[in-house]
């Protein structure tokens, strides 16, 4: 979750739980590395094509930031909407040979969101 690197107000419990999972991943990467086990985390921004994001929630969040729904969904450096396929494709790629020598990495999938909010 992007809340590890860019937490927001009103999300203390959520942000703390995500940060704890991130730290656990880093420790396990050190402990299991000798066995060839790699652990990495992805930090997506909001993934809008999931059931969590109803029209009502999107409208409320956009209004909170004084943005249109489209502006809210693309409020990042690249001005792109992050969807579940984006996250899934990166997760699958990280299991392959391109990332075979990568462990304990924290990879954002957010279009640069933590740079604008």
Predicted segments, located by residue:
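Short, small/polar-rich loop/turn modules that mediate ligand/substrate recognition or access, typified
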Residues: 33, 38, 102-104
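A glycine/serine/threonine-rich, flexible loop-to-helix segment
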Residues: 47-75
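Residue(s) in the substrate-gating loop at a strand-loop-helix junction
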Residues: 1
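Catalytic tyrosine of NAD(P)H-dependent dehydrogenase/reductases that use a Tyr as the general acid/base
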Residues: 14, 22
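Active-site helix of classical SDR
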Residues: 17, 25
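C-terminal substrate-recognition "lid" of short-chain dehydrogenase/reductases
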Residues: 80-109, 114-115
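Active-site loop immediately N-terminal to the catalytic Tyr-X3-Lys motif
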Residues: 6-12, 79, 97
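Conserved SDR Rossmann-fold cofactor-binding beta-strand/turn motif
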Residues: 38-48, 108-110
């Amino acid at each position: 979750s992007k809340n590890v690197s860019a937490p927001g107000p009103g999300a203390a419990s959520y942000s703390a739980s995500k940060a704890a999972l991130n730290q656990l991943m880093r420790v396990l990467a050190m402990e299991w590395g000798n066995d060839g086990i790699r652990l990495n985390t992805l930090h997506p921004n909001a993934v809008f094509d999931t059931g969590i994001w109803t029209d009502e929630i999107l409208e409320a969040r956009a209004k909170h930031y004084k943005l249109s729904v489209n502006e809210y969904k693309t409020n990042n450096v690249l001005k792109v909407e992050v969807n579940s396929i984006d996250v899934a494709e990166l997760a699958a790629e990280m299991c392959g040979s391109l990332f075979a020598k990568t462990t304990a990495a924290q990879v954002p999938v957010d279009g640069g969101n933590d740079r604008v909010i």
